[in-house]
Amino acid sequence: MRTLLMADIHGNFAALRAILSTPEAQSCGRVISLGDQVNFGPESRKVVETLRLLGATMLMGNHEERLLHPDDFAGYNWAMLRVTAGQLSGISLADLPVDVRIGSALLTHGTPGDPYHLVYPPDLPEVLNTLPEDVSLLISGHNHLCWDVTSGHRRAFNPGSAGLNETG
């Protein structure tokens, strides 16, 4: 079964709609979003509702976590978190998993067990060495950069950001 894999949509419903309208996306039997479905973009509710309507597997990203615990975060986007929380009134994000296993693949937002931890290609050999022996593929998002790295018998992949591209 083909899988549509995306990360870091960040409330950008226009970007999600554009992705879903492609023939490639329409031929996929499964949809997975690696976290940060919400915040920054103006339509977090539409993003979450659309993904749920599609039966997508959604992971917990750091922005969903921040919405669940807003008082723990007094950073630069505190006000934006409050606006996003208002948009999502009545929608629960607390049940989103941090990690998902599919066969020998481990999917996560940041690093396994931690949606806040950023990982970059130079750090991947160390991160991959901490995985259970039966995991051969790590798929993560969070840093908005697309990369594909092999280290030994393991591979790590990041699809980049679907809704908040920071690479130009």
Regions picked out by a protein language model, each given a short descriptive name:
Residues 1-4, 100-107, 151-155:
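Beta-strand-turn-beta hairpins that frame and shape the catalytic cleft
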Residues 6-7, 31-36, 57-62, 107-108, ...:
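Active-site neighborhood of phospho(di)ester-bond hydrolases with catalytic His/Asp-centered motifs
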